[in-house]
């Protein structure tokens, strides 16, 4: 979601609604914009929608805009599946949540996008979902795989690596494995301390 830090919550929604109205008007003309633009617009609308059923419908409509998945739109389609999976998860539909979360991650894998920032919340959310579904080992395995990819493409002292370590710590804590939880939390906070040495309030 696009962030507008200068808007408070009310004005943020008001501002986003204004932007969406402008874009909706523009994209009504078929020769303006692409299928991806239309999908993104529906995704924005789903983000602002307060009624779960309507938000789910908007995300499904967004996915329906894109007939063929290519290297150019794979990241967007993966995000749409992740968002739809998240909505299903929050609204008590675990089977549909799993289906879309797994599709989201398989697209990242298929198009060699597992190392990008988008993969971190998607895989972290999937791992937490698996833990809720009494499958913490699978969740841990997904996060360990992601840790290896981040280390290979970036490093093991970057913010992305720390976020994954913190999620691992959270899952171990949820499953009452305190020694492992402590190990991963320590790794995460060591990185946070280094990155935010000049901004301790961020830790």
What label would you give each PLM region?
Residues 62, 84, 97-107, 161-162, ...:
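Fold-core signature of tandem repeat domains
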Residues 4-9, 31, 46-49, 53, ...:
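Short coil/turn linking the two alpha-helices of tandem helical-hairpin repeats
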Residues 13-17, 52, 94, 136, ...:
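TPR-repeat structural position
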Residues 9-31, 55-66, 146:
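Amphipathic alpha-helices of TPR/Sel1-like and other helical repeat/solenoid scaffolds
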Residues 24-28, 63-68, 105-112, 144-152, ...:
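Amphipathic alpha-helical segments of tetratricopeptide repeats
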Residues 5-8, 37-50, 75-90, 117-132, ...:
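Conserved alpha-helical positions within TPR/SEL1-like repeat arrays
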Residues 31, 36-38, 70, 77, ...:
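Residues that mark the junctions of alpha-helical repeat units in TPR/alpha-solenoid scaffolds
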């Amino acid at each position: 979601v696009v962030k507008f830090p200068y808007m408070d919550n009310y004005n943020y929604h008001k501002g986003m609604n204004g932007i969406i109205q402008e874009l909706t008007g523009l994209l009504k003309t078929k020769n303006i914009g692409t299928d991806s633009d239309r999908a993104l617009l529906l995704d924005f609308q789903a983000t602002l929608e307060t009624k779960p059923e309507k938000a789910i419908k908007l995300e499904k409509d967004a996915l329906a805009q894109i007939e063929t998945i290519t290297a150019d739109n794979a990241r967007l389609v993966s995000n749409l599946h992740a968002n739809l999976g998240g909505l299903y998860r929050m609204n008590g539909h675990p089977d549909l949540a799993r289906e879309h979360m797994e599709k989201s991650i398989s697209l990242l894998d298929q198009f060699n996008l597992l190392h990008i920032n988008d993969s971190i919340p998607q895989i972290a959310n999937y791992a937490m979902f698996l833990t809720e579904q009494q499958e913490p080992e699978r969740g841990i395995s997904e996060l360990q795989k992601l840790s290896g990819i981040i280390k290979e493409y970036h490093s093991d002292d970057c913010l992305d690596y720390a976020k994954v370590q913190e999620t691992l710590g959270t899952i171990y804590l949820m499953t009452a494995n305190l020694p492992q939880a402590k190990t991963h939390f320590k790794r995460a906070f060591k990185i946070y301390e280094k990155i935010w040495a000049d901004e301790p309030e961020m830790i």
